[in-house]
């Protein structure tokens, strides 16, 4: 039995080592303080947890299965690949775990107007869904480029009664949508609650989103012990902002000496070309209220990120991932657009599961590693979402 890792972060100021924190304008200081205070109360309130657990079970469909992909494993000829099926959550991805938690907080705080940012549209759909469920006004900011790539999700949000506001600034993707949402929050601090979709932004968001997503890892730990009789050798998740990955990794951090934790970023067209691999190629900087590793030019200007998957197309990454990389508890690598497409194709043809392009980045790494490992080894992949939203891109790229 290897020694357990003792891990505790963030500190009371929201720092994960040198990362994280609250780099915010004065207009948001009270909002941030109120949010943190209310969250810490909710965190210790059994009634809050009971309400959330009930919704996760009866509305979202948790626990999601841990599925042994035996044909995919056989194809690779090595380790056994298991899939944590977050694609089976209501709305098609892990994002709803967090949206539900935050909307319950908004209700506790008496907020009536909800805003959110979205890249792939999955967080937008999840937020629109929970706002419809609770009868709250909802505005989602989305980059024009992402609106083009993710038309079905835009239609879903509108059908759910949400106003989708196109963002035409900058790269017209997730970074710009986030900036616009923060601007809205600064202009309407009293009545508005901002539901952040990933483990990014100022404290307490990275901690809060992690806590709401950690249900993924809690379930997986129990399921793999029940089904395989032991902990896995490797756990893999894709990393954009990083919420599905931190949700999976957090419960396994004490076991990091015996379980290898791997985060897979988007290498896009290649690490020397256009990509979104902030942990691999980024430098330390501040974006959206938090210190993190960022893609930036020689003058410190934030660069545009590129990935075939809209959900990984962010030039930064959650501060906790930066800290875990620095501590050596998680190892980060990257997968190109082409490799992700090939993995998506292979999973569809061997297991009958069409996953999201984001998740396909993790699947590719798992397939590659499985081929190099003995048959009795276990790799768990967080299959963070389903591929319905990506069919336009998939049809185009795979010439279907």
Swiss-Prot record:
GO molecular function, one term: tryptophan synthase activity
Coiled coil: none
CDD domains on file: Trp-synth_B
Pfam family, any one: PALP
Essential cofactor(s): pyridoxal 5'-phosphate
Known partners and oligomeric status: Tetramer of two alpha and two beta chains.
Protein name from the UniProt record: Tryptophan synthase beta chain
Protein source organism: Chlorobaculum tepidum (strain ATCC 49652 / DSM 12025 / NBRC 103806 / TLS) (Chlorobium tepidum)
Gene name of the encoded protein: trpB-1
């Amino acid at each position: 039995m290897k020694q357990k890792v003792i891990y505790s972060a963030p500190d009371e100021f929201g720092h994960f080592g040198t990362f994280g924190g609250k780099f915010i304008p004065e207009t948001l200081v009270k909002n941030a303080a109120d949010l943190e205070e209310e969250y810490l109360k909710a965190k210790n309130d059994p009634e809050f947890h009971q309400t959330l657990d009930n919704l996760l079970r009866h509305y979202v469909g948790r626990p999601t299965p841990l599925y042994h992909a035996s044909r995919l494993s056989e194809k690779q000829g090595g380790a056994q690949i298991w899939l944590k099926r977050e694609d089976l959550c209501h709305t098609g991805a892990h994002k709803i775990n967090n949206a539900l938690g935050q909307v319950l907080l908004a209700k506790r705080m008496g907020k009536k107007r909800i805003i959110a940012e979205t890249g792939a549209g999955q967080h937008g759909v999840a937020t629109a869904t929970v706002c419809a469920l609770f009868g709250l006004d909802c505005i989602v900011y989305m980059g024009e480029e992402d609106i083009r790539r993710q038309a079905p999700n835009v239609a879903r949000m509108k059908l759910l009664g949400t106003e989708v506001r196109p963002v035409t600034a900058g790269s017209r993707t997730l970074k710009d949508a986030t900036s616009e949402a923060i601007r809205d929050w600064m202009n309407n601090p009293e009545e508005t609650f901002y539901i952040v979709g990933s483990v990014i932004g100022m404290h307490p968001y990275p901690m809060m989103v992690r806590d709401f997503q950690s249900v993924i890892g809690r379930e997986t730990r129990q399921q793999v012990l029940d089904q395989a009789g032991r902990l896995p050798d490797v756990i893999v998740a894709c990393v954009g902002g990083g919420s599905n990955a931190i949700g999976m990794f957090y419960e396994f951090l004490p076991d990091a000496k015996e379980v290898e934790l791997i985060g897979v970023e988007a290498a896009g067209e290649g690490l020397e070309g256009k990509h979104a691999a902030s942990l691999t190629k980024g430098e330390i900087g501040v974006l959206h209220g938090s210190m993190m590793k960022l893609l930036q030019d020689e003058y410190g200007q934030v660069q545009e990120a590129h990935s075939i998957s809209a959900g990984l197309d962010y030039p930064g990454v959650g501060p906790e991932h930066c800290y875990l990389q620095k501590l050596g508890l998680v190892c980060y690598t990257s997968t190109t657009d082409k490799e992700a497409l090939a993995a998506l194709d292979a999973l569809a043809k061997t297991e009958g599961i069409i996953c999201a392009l984001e998740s396909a980045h993790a699947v590719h790494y798992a397939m590659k590693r499985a081929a190099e490992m003995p048959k009795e080894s276990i790799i768990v992949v967080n299959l963070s979402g389903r591929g319905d939203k990506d069919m336009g891109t998939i049809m185009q790229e795979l010439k279907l």
